[in-house]
Amino acid sequence: MEKTYDPKAIEKKWADYWEKRQLSKPTAQGSPYCIMLPPPNVTGTLHMGHGFQQTLMDTLIRYHRMKGERTLWQGGTDHAGIATQMVVEQQLAQEDLTREDLGRQAFIKRVWEWRERSGGKITHQMRRLGVSIDWSRERFSMDEGLSRATTEAFIRLHHEGLIYRGKRLVNWDPKLNTAISDLEVVTEEVEGHLWHIRYPLAEGSGHLIIATTRPETLLGDVAIAVHPQDERYQPFVGKKVRLPLTDRTIPVIADEAVDKEFGTGSLKITPGHDFNDYEIGQRHQLPLINILTSEGYLNENVPEPYRGLERFEARKKIIADLQRENLLEKTEPYRVPVPRGERSGVIIEPLLTDQWFIKMEALAKPAMEAVESGELKFIPKNWEKTYLQWLSNIQDWCISRQLWWGHRLPVWYDEEKNSYVGRSREEILKKYHLSPDVKLQQETDVLDTWFSASLWPFATLGWPEKTESFKTFYPTQVLVTGFDIIFFWVARMVMMGLKLTHKIPFHSVYIHGLIRDSQGRKMSKSKGNVIDPIDIIDGISLDALIEKRTHALLQPKMAKTIEKMTRKEFPNGIASFGTDALRFTFCALASRGRDINFDMGRIDGYRNFCNKIWNAARFVTMNTQEKDLNPEKPLSYSAADEWIRTRLQQTIKNAEEALSQYRFDLLAQTLYEFTWNEYCDWYVEFAKCILYDKQAKPAQLRGTRVALLEVLEILLRLLHPVMPFITEEIWQTVAPLAGKEGKSIMVEHWPQFNIHEMNYDAKVEIEWVKNVITAIRTLRAEIGISPAKRIPVIFGKGDEKDKKRIAKMKSYIKTLGKVSQLRFAKHDDCFSATATGIVERLEIHIPLAGVIDKQTEIARLKKEISKLQKEEEKSLKKLDNPNYLQRAPQEVVEKERLSLEKTQNALKKLQSQYASIESL
């Protein structure tokens, strides 16, 4: 093994090795275990959320593969309709072309060319993360099989009357000219205005005043709504007002949805351009007026002076005209929530359009029953409530998009606009008994990306055909995903799975938190706080990081702020940490049900953990290679050997429990504590006492060498699911020494807990001697004895058991405690000039004479005592102040009391030491 651990030297080697030998294929004979990768966008690059989620999935997959299960991690990418179309359109724009210039077929050809050329970036990055996906089965949501499955699903749902075409309000992106889902809308609060507008009464004098943040939609108003219990407006309900700037009158209606406290308490109702107004309009059977074109210009349904104006230009003119006609009461500043398209960046409009929908109520009921009956489980369980609430309030799903890239709807129209659904023109002619001469035009819309994504768990396995893969791996075991897509993806997969396969698509849903920055903020390009996981693995210079964060910002003015923040947070850029340190960090941070604030300090600690493992493995191999490890010869285990073997069994049990409960954080904690605190810090040091003892017998040496090797080899297998690269590299050296043969640790057996390997007496003895050594080390540190200086130790009190243990563990205590000589106290020993510690009944005394410099130590103690006395005085002053006790929060007062207690205890200890040293 090399002297230092260099992840760059090994990671690509082992990733290529695993893939070349197809070790991720489901070849084992055990029970099937399958996880579906939430397909990342083909346009995407790996971000921290991907890295976190895929680490958790890979940990599960590697664990179950090692348990001998027939394990499949089904991977693939999503065609990402809007995102991909935008990327290719931007490329065309650089050639001064539009998609319309190319035409649909040529444009689709260009998209496929782009996908072949650039679409594999994210899967390459995933390989860097070490994910053990079966790449030979990789799917793409637009490949032939998945396209066939998507068409089949649409046709079956339509045949059952669950798909229909209708006019409804949708999120409309005027730049992309398509409907988009709620998930593709990003709402941000900006400084805006609240305009108070007078609506004159149609009869008599007077007016009602409404407050709005969107005066341009006034031209589509069809009513004024007030709360039925609002006494101010009860006399006006049923009357009419004149709609400003038009020749229309509209009614005043009462509806409980109106917020009496907002604005003036009266609300303009524009059902064609507001989702809440649409619901009110439906209840009161109000007309729907659409005043916008698909590009966001005012249409022919508005008075002539406003036709053709861009929506925000129209706003300016309407405000000016209202002022001129004395209909603008006042304008006040107001924080306005503005919905923007995630991809286009433009403000989204609720727009009334003809779209295709799925009736969701009938699909939602069995999906709810699956959770209520316990057939489908959420982890943590509290997410079941969120899932059920969403499904109980479900609306019909708009599945059509006005794009060119995607699954085209299997719908054709004749010249009379009659629609026909089928797999092809030929099938439709036959199915509907149409003349071969009839002219049929296919629907230009494509399906929402989430529609094909909802089929992912079974379509990727061959559905609608009953393939071997489908029969073996469906339903899958667990879905690992974030809470933000429980409704958009999880619930829809459950509904589609139950409807089309009559089975739930997975037995469990593990919901993880979102990765945020160190301050708890969501990571986003606009905030400039995104960290690329590959940059953590490989490292990146400060200049390159700033360039990456400030390039192609939607708001270029943020560049200076982002640069300043980046320089402060990463003054030296980001160091190279390697994949295993990053993966271990992700697992360690994966507390159930909580978002994760990513702290670079944690990953620095886990890089040190990698180094610790490496150095321990080097020590083991250096002390076992070409040594006598003959299993035929007798061996004798020391108490420390028995102790570490016992602790290993407990670690196996704890790791198994943590994984079975999806407690990745507890898994990491268990492995870290055993590896660092017990194997490296204690056992390796205990082993040296045997290995470096010239009096040690061959059987003792063999016992310790075998224990070092066997425990390390098993520990590597426990660590492997989380840290695949370093464990594979070390295992390839360690396994032959431990008498194991195999092509990869990846397909070795997961360690089995064996209660017969546990020696409780050795456990008690070694924990006792650890406490004794720790007490000696603590006393040395407290009185300032150099770590290299050997000291005498006298034991007082204790019993026969303690004496036997000390005799047995003498070499451990002397070596690890840096003790020159140790003995039990005599009757005439005086302990006034000693530092004293206690372990159970045993007293530990370090004579101070000749061990320390009296005057130097007295000066140091005086300084420390003075410092603590000032802290004590400060705390007492606070706690004696009645005002402080009354006004400060209870938890602050309690914290101060605990601080005082801690200070006083430390003070007593130092004063005792001072008295002891002064008496020398």
Swiss-Prot record:
**Which Gene Ontology MF annotations are present?**
aminoacyl-tRNA deacylase activity; ATP binding; valine-tRNA ligase activity
User: Where is coiled-coil annotated?
Assistant: 642-668, 849-920
Q: Per the Swiss-Prot or TrEMBL record, what residue ranges does the short sequence motif 'KMSKS' region cover? A: 522-526
Q: Cellular component terms, GO, for this chain's entry?
A: cytosol
Question: Which residues are involved in binding ATP?
Answer: K525
Concerning PROSITE patterns, the annotation shows:
AA_TRNA_LIGASE_I
GO BP: valyl-tRNA aminoacylation
Task: Report the superkingdom from the record.
Answer: Bacteria
Q: Which reaction does it catalyse?
A: tRNA(Val) + L-valine + ATP = L-valyl-tRNA(Val) + AMP + diphosphate
Concerning Gene3D superfamilies, the annotation shows: HUPs, Isoleucyl-tRNA Synthetase, Domain 1, Valyl-tRNA synthetase, C-terminal domain, Valyl/Leucyl/Isoleucyl-tRNA synthetase, editing domain
The UniProt record lists the keyword rRNA-binding: no
The listed locations are:
Cytoplasm
Q: What is its main location?
A: cytoplasm
**What does the annotation say about its assembly with partners?**
Monomer.
Kindly give the NCBIfam families that the UniProt entry links to this protein.
Answer: PRK05729.1, valS
Q: Which family does it belong to?
A: Belongs to the class-I aminoacyl-tRNA synthetase family. ValS type 1 subfamily.
Task: Give the protein's recorded name.
Answer: Valine--tRNA ligase
